[in-house]
């Protein structure tokens, strides 16, 4: 489970108009939510205990022929799916147009409303490596699993780290594995979507691979503030049509960024209106 990041110094300039999001007010947790949350935390701990040896064995077995760590990463993304399926408070679904070939590489981008977005996006049926803040890799067990799965660390504000991360992203794409980036750089703390940064779009143009937009909705209530108990969440990740980059140059980064942001914003607003 990761928190995605973008290289420092790649801020976008797209204007962020005020959006109207759903009411984030969550009623007090009752006995049912307390029991369901306790059960879900137990499931999470059991899954971690099970996944650590499974991933270690998978890594060792596939190491000679899977330099992209596709299989060990694919196994890792299945853990959040199991955790969600056994959490009675959360209902997640994937909609939209899924890629015909999951091994075609994309730069995948999404809006970012909650830490739970990571668990939700893990439901998409293909493997991708996540560009993530380096401090996430320092979390005991979780950070080790991220490293084992081939996710890509980035130290914010460090140009050398940014260059190394972008080189890793290019390597992953050449091995026909997608890269996942939250172009806002961090979670939005309001109903507004932050401006997008340039990094993901520069990467897509340099690698000449399509941008695949995802839209997440409904995760803001999944975690309660200052409470160990979970909230009720009916969340959706929608897969949109890929945006091609053939023939584009680095001079087109800003236009591509703004186009993709507008697509995600429009679809997110439509999803909110449909759920209202």
Task: Show the residue positions of the predicted features.
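Non-catalytic C-terminal accessory region of glycerolipid acyltransferases
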Residues: 2-27, 31-35, 163-276
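Membrane-anchoring hydrophobic helices of lipid-metabolizing enzymes
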Residues: 2-106
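Catalytic core of membrane glycerolipid acyltransferases/transacylases, capturing the structured
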Residues: 55-74, 78, 85-87, 102-159
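A generic structural signal for alpha->beta connector loops
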Residues: 89-91, 127, 148, 176, ...
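Generic preference for hydrophobic
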Residues: 94, 108, 130-131, 237-239
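Thr-Gly-centered strand-to-loop micro-motif
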Residues: 95, 131-133, 155-156, 183, ...
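Alpha-helical membrane-embedding segments
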Residues: 95-113, 162-165, 173, 266-267, ...
């Amino acid at each position: 489970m990761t928190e995605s990041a973008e290289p420092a110094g790649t801020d976008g300039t797209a204007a962020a108009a005020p959006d109207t999001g759903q009411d984030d007010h969550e009623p007090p947790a009752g006995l049912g939510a307390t029991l369901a949350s306790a059960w879900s935390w137990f499931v999470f701990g059991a899954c971690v205990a099970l996944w650590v040896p499974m991933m270690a064995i998978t890594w060792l077995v596939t190491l000679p022929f899977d330099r992209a760590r596709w299989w060990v990463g694919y196994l890792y993304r299945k853990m959040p799916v199991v955790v969600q399926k056994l959490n009675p408070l959360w209902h997640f679904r994937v909609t939209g147009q899924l890629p015909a070939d999951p091994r075609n590489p994309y730069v995948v981008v999404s809006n970012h409303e909650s830490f739970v977005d990571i668990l939700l996006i893990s439901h998409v049926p293909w493997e991708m490596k996540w560009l993530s803040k380096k401090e996430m890799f320092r979390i005991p067990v979780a950070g080790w699993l991220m490293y084992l799965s081939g996710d890509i660390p980035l130290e914010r504000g460090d140009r050398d780290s940014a260059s190394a991360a972008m080189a890793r992203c290019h390597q992953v794409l050449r091995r026909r594995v997608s890269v996942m980036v939250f172009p806002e750089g961090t979670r939005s703390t309001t109903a507004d979507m932050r401006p997008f940064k340039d990094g993901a779009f520069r990467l897509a143009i340099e690698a000449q691979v399509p941008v695949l937009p995802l839209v997440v909705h409904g995760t803001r209530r999944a975690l309660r503030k200052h409470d160990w108990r979970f909230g009720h969440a009916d969340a959706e990740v929608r897969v949109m049509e890929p945006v091609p980059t053939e023939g584009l140059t680095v001079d087109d980064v800003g236009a591509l960024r703004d186009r993709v942001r507008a697509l995600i914003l429009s679809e997110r607003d439509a999803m909110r209106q449909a759920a209202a």
